[in-house]
Structure formats: structure tokens, C-alpha cells
A protein has these predicted regions:
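P-loop NTPase Walker
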Residues: 1-81, 260, 473-476
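Conserved helicase C-terminal RecA-like lobe
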Residues: 343-485
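Accessory N-terminal region flanking or inserted into the helicase ATPase core
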Residues: 1-7, 16, 32, 103-189, ...
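Conserved interdomain hinge at the start of the Helicase C-terminal
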Residues: 284-297
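Conserved helicase motor core of SF1/SF2 NTP-dependent helicases
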Residues: 8-14, 38-41, 194-280, 300-318, ...
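Conserved two-lobed SF2 helicase motor
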Residues: 66, 168-172, 428-436
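Conserved beta-strand -> loop -> alpha-helix junction used to position metal-binding or nucleic-acid-contacting
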Residues: 58-76, 321-345
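A polyampholytic, Gly/Pro-enriched intrinsically disordered region
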Residues: 79-98, 262-270, 338-372
């Protein structure tokens, strides 16, 4: 029996699936249950929740994983037989091209990304089950590439894989289907199914063909990875018993109203009715990001493309608000840590060699004898008194005077944040991300920027369903207050 579980935002899809897992565990062995999802994050979250709920170990649940990793295991592939970033770079060198590659599981998002349009065309074609030429003719790439260059690239890539006996992620799935390597399960769960590519649907089918019961869970309205090969139409056309989740535990009423307006613009979708929670919630509109008062609470700030986050960073930086950009390492983290360690040292706490060398890096020779780091006992703990007595440390002033070698801009930022009462030893209150980067996330306050880049604007006009789904996902991250920033150009941008 095949059941399609439709899970609108915040309706507890994973919990529902685990309750079904529970029923099967009463009558079957854990290793007869397959639970596959698109991202590693979701597969492991389900596995960990199942382990604690049913008191099982990781070994009891060998089939809670991504489809890629099932294929990898069943085909008995070794890690060094898989095309890695270095292989793509090496191939690029040999061809005189730049071929970069970001791991499928960078961020555990299950997505393949590259800046090389040649490689992207080849990969997306494979995921969609079409030829590279057919993908080329869809004109989704932006770089100037000739068909001849593409054919040459395909030839060289195949030759490279043969020469070095390598396989790539998508080949694994195709091989798995060809070799018919699926175990026999009593029940299979396929989560986040709206993100599967045509090739992965083929693999899913080869698994459920040998299985008594199958649950396919997802939400076509949240299918935001079509550009990366996801095949939402296969999800929409699935037949089986429909199990519709109707109560959202996340979305308040006003956000539900906005979400309904957006979702009704999507042409190709499965109809769903779902209810918000009882809270009314809040909705605000602004002309400019700087008008939003973000001095308190937890925030998710969402833009359509990565580069749009840079201006927002500048605003938060100048206001002295504690934030992180999901796509960058925190520029101040090292300095905060040193500040905390320094303050502890001044209070009489002893600190390690590593902490001292970090502190020393923000001081000039006038304040710290750098040479002594060579002779210092790496395993000992040190106090302010011992460092001062040895004349290694020549100041015990407050950090912003003592750290005379620290970049002044960062010092000012940290001081401003502290004046604002920001808690610098915990995770930042404000997270900046693209909408694609927070799928599955939620926050009390969500700021949604509706500007579109030129490329996106063009895509929106040609294919509005993709952008409608994306802004639906953006709006439905809000647990309480949705803050919408109107587009800078009223003729462009996404209207909410």
C-alpha cells in the first residue's frame, strides 16, 4: 500500500512519520524499516529521534539514511572511488578550464553546486534523465558555451572517470537501479520527496517495488530546488492513499493569510487545506530594512540571493546588533573569545596556552612579549599574576585598551553590541540567510526581503511557480511576526 503524506509548513511531518515507524516496530525488526530523505540532516534527525523514542542504537537502524548513502553502501563503493573536488579541479587543469565543485553534503543539503556551467549542465541532465544537449537547449545556463565545448567536456569527463576508475554521486544512483540492489523492506518512508530528482524517483521506485508498504512524504508547495534538478511533477503525480496533515503548530493566523495568498498563485499543485495555530500573530510592512527594530528577540532575515545579504550586514554592524551570516564564518568570533578569556584572566581565572596566544595576537609588543610564547609550557595553566611576574604581560587594562593590535572597527562593533546588552557568549540572535538556505527552519521574527536580482526577475516572469513556492517557504518560517520589506523598485520584485 502506498500512502502520500502531505505536510504543509509546521504540521509535524517528521513526528507523524515516526509515529508510523512506531506502529511497524511493534511487529517488525528495525532493519526491515527503510527511512530515506533527501538531506543527511533530515535522515539523521529522524534516526536520532527514533533512537531516543524507541531506545535503539545507531546500529539498530541501518537504513535511516539518504538515498545516496544507501546506494554507496549497497554497491560496496569505497570513499576513494568517488569523484571529489580535487578530481574536478584536476580535470579542469588538464582541459585548461576552471571546474570547481562543492560537495553534495556541504551543509548536508543534498544539493550539488558548482560555478562551472559545463559541469552543471552535465549533472542536471543526469538528474533529470535527459542528455547534456537537451539540457543545453533549455538555456538555463548563463555562461557562453558552445555545443562543441560541451561535447568535448562530456567526453573528457567520461574518459577521466574511466582512467582513474571513479564514479560520481549520480552514477551511484543509476548503478543501484541497474544492479537492482535494494534490500527487501516491510515498510519504507521517503521524506522530503518533493526534492527528489527524476533519477532519485527511479531509485525510490526500485526500493518500493520490493516493499509491502510505502509512505511518501513532502509538500509540493515547498519544492524550491527545481533549478537543482528536483522533479516536483513526479511528486504531484504520485497515486495512493492521501494522508493530509491539517494543523500547523508553527504558523499564526496572519501569516497563514499571507501564505494562502501566495500559494493560490501556484498553477501546478496538489490542493490542501490546513489550519493555523490559535495565536493571531503579527504582520508588518516596511519600505526599508533599516526601519525594522531588531534590538530584541530572535530573528531570521531572508533575501532571495546571497549578495543581497552584504548590505544588510553593514546595517546590523553599524547598529551594533549581534548577527551571523549563514554563508560566512563569523568575523568576530575569535576576538569575542579573546575578550572573554581576558576578562576571566583579570578576574583571577587561570587560562591555557592556547587562550594566551589568542590574546597575544591582539596585542602589540608594548603589551605582550611575543617571544616568550616559544618557551611557555604548553600544558600549564597561567594566571594574570604569573604572567605579570615574568614580565611577559605588561598590561592589565580593560580589553579595548589592552588589545591595541585589534582592528578598531571590530573593537567598536563589540563595544557597541555590549552596550546594547547582546549576549556574545551564546549564538547570534539574528541569522541572515537566503530562503533556500533555511528550508525547514523557523523563527519568532522573520524579515522577508522581496527584491529580485535581474536573473531572478527574468525567471519569475518566465516561470512564476518557482518564485511563488520560494516566497511561500520564506513567509512560512515565521512563528509569530512576519516583517515584509517592499522592493526598492516598485516595478520589480515580488509582491506580497
Amino acid at each position: 500500500l502506498k500512502t502520500i503524506v502531505l505536510g504543509p509548513p509546521g504540521t509535524g511531518k517528521t513526528t507523524t512519520l515516526l509515529n508510523e515507524v512506531d506502529k511497524y516496530l511493534k511487529q517488525t525488526d528495525p532493519d526491515k524499516i527503510g527511512y530515506f530523505s533527501f538531506t543527511q540532516k533530515a535522515a539523521y534527525e529522524a534516526r536520532d529521534r527514533a533512537m531516543s523514542k524507541f531506545n535503539l542504537s545507531e546500529d539498530d537502524l541501518p537504513y535511516f539514511r539518504t538515498l545516496h548513502s544507501l546506494a554507496f553502501r549497497r554497491l560496496g563503493i569505497k570513499k576513494d572511488e568517488v569523484m571529489q573536488r580535487r578530481h574536478y579541479e584536476d580535470l579542469g587543469k588538464k582541459m585548461g578550464l576552471i571546474v570547481d565543485y562543492h560537495e553534495y553534503d556541504n551543509e548536508h543539503s543534498g544539493l550539488f553546486t558548482t560555478k562551472s556551467d559545463l559541469l552543471r549542465i552535465v549533472q542536471i541532465a543526469k538528474l533529470r534523465g535527459i542528455t547534456p544537449e537537451q539540457q543545453y537547449n533549455l538555456k538555463e545556463h548563463t555562461q557562453d558555451i558552445t555545443v562543441h565545448q560541451l561535447k568535448q567536456f562530456v567526453h573528457d569527463l567520461d574518459q577521466y572517470k574511466k582512467d582513474y576508475n571513479l564514479i560520481d554521486f549520480t552514477d551511484m544512483i543509476t548503478e543501484f537501479i541497474k544492479a537492482d540492489r535494494s534490500p527487501r523492506f516491510d515498510v519504507v518512508f521517503i521524506d522530503e520527496a518533493q526534492d527528489l530528482s527524476q533519477t532519485q524517483w527511479g531509485m525510490a521506485k526500485s526500493i518500493w517495488d520490493k516493499t509491502q508498504d510505502t509512505f511518501i512524504a513532502g509538500d509540493d508547495d515547498q519544492a524550491i530546488f527545481r533549478w537543482a534538478g528536483a522533479d516536483v511533477d513526479s511528486f504531484i503525480s504520485q497515486t495512493g492513499k492521501i494522508m493530509q496533515l491539517t494543523q500547523s503548530y508553527r504558523i499564526p493566523q496572519v501569516v497563514h493569510d499571507v501564505a494562502s495568498r501566495i500559494v493560490n498563485k501556484i498553477q501546478n499543485r496538489l490542493p490542501k487545506e490546513w489550519r493555523p495555530k490559535t495565536q493571531r500573530g503579527l504582520l508588518s510592512y516596511y519600505d526599508d530594512f533599516e526601519q525594522v527594530n531588531m534590538k530584541q528577540g530572535n530573528w531570521l532575515v531572508l533575501a532571495r540571493t546571497k549578495f543581497m545579504l552584504n548590505d544588510l550586514e553593514d546595517t546590523l554592524y553599524s547598529q551594533g546588533l549581534y548577527y551571523q551570516n549563514k554563508f560566512k564564518t563569523n568575523r568576530e568570533q575569535d576576538l569575542y573569545t579573546a575578550v572573554n578569556d581576558w576578562e576571566n584572566l583579570r578576574k583571577g581565572v587561570d587560562i591555557s596556552y592556547e587562550q594566551i596566544s589568542r590574546i597575544a595576537s591582539y596585542m602589540s609588543e608594548k603589551h605582550f612579549e611575543k617571544n616568550c610564547l616559544k618557551y611557555m609550557d604548553k600544558d600549564a595553566r597561567h594566571t594574570m599574576q604569573s604572567l605579570r611576574e615574568r614580565m611577559w604581560l605588561k598590561t592589565n587594562d580593560v580589553w579595548y585598551n589592552a588589545f591595541d593590535n585589534a582592528p578598531q572597527k571590530k573593537v567598536r562593533y563589540i563595544r557597541r553590541m555590549r552596550e546594547n546588552g547582546e549576549k556574545l557568549n551564546s549564538t547570534p540572535r539574528i541569522t541572515l540567510s537566503t530562503i533556500h538556505g533555511v528550508k525547514g527552519g523557523e523563527q519568532d521574527n522573520v524579515v522577508l526581503l522581496t527584491d529580485l536580482s535581474r536573473n531572478t526577475q527574468r525567471n519569475y516572469e518566465q516561470n512564476p511557480d518557482d518564485e511563488n513556492r520560494l516566497f511561500y517557504v520564506g513567509a512560512t518560517r515565521a512563528k509569530n511576526h512576519l516583517h515584509v520589506i517592499r522592493p526598492k523598485d516598485i516595478y520589480k520584485g515580488y509582491k506580497i
